[in-house]
Amino acid sequence: MAATIKKGALVRVVTGNLENSLEALASDRRLPSYMFNSTAEVLDVKDDYALIKFYVPTPSVWLKLEQLEPV
C-alpha cells in the first residue's frame, strides 16, 4: 500500500494507525476531526513519511506512510 502513495496523491488518515502512535503521543492528544473526516494531498514523500496538506487552513504535517491510505 505505501508504495502506491506518491506526490500529488489524495489520501485519508487511518485512525487506528495514527492513534497511540509515536507521532500522536508526541503532540496534543486531541486530534482534530478534519484529520479523519477529510482527504489530504501528498506534497512530498521522504523515506517512510509523507508531507500532507488538508484542505482547511492548517499547516501541513508529516505522517508515516502506514498511517495513510489512498483515496
From Swiss-Prot:
<keyword id="KW-0520">NAD</keyword>
<keyword id="KW-0813">Transport</keyword>
<comment type="subunit">
    <text>NDH-1 can be composed of about 15 different subunits; different subcomplexes with different compositions have been identified which probably have different functions.</text>
</comment>
<comment type="function">
    <text>NDH-1 shuttles electrons from an unknown electron donor, via FMN and iron-sulfur (Fe-S) centers, to quinones in the respiratory and/or the photosynthetic chain. The immediate electron acceptor for the enzyme in this species is believed to be plastoquinone. Couples the redox reaction to proton translocation, and thus conserves the redox energy in a proton gradient. Cyanobacterial NDH-1 also plays a role in inorganic carbon-concentration.</text>
</comment>
<comment type="similarity">
    <text>Belongs to the complex I NdhO subunit family.</text>
</comment>
<keyword id="KW-1278">Translocase</keyword>
<keyword id="KW-0521">NADP</keyword>
<keyword id="KW-0618">Plastoquinone</keyword>
<keyword id="KW-0472">Membrane</keyword>
<dbReference type="InterPro" id="IPR020905">
    <property type="entry name" value="NdhO"/>
</dbReference>
<dbReference type="Pfam" id="PF11910">
    <property type="entry name" value="NdhO"/>
</dbReference>
<dbReference type="GO" id="GO:0031676">
    <property type="term" value="C:plasma membrane-derived thylakoid membrane"/>
</dbReference>
<protein>
    <recommendedName>
        <fullName>NAD(P)H-quinone oxidoreductase subunit O</fullName>
        <ecNumber>7.1.1.-</ecNumber>
    </recommendedName>
</protein>
<keyword id="KW-0874">Quinone</keyword>
<keyword id="KW-0793">Thylakoid</keyword>
<dbReference type="GO" id="GO:0016655">
    <property type="term" value="F:oxidoreductase activity, acting on NAD(P)H, quinone or similar compound as acceptor"/>
</dbReference>
<dbReference type="GO" id="GO:0048038">
    <property type="term" value="F:quinone binding"/>
</dbReference>
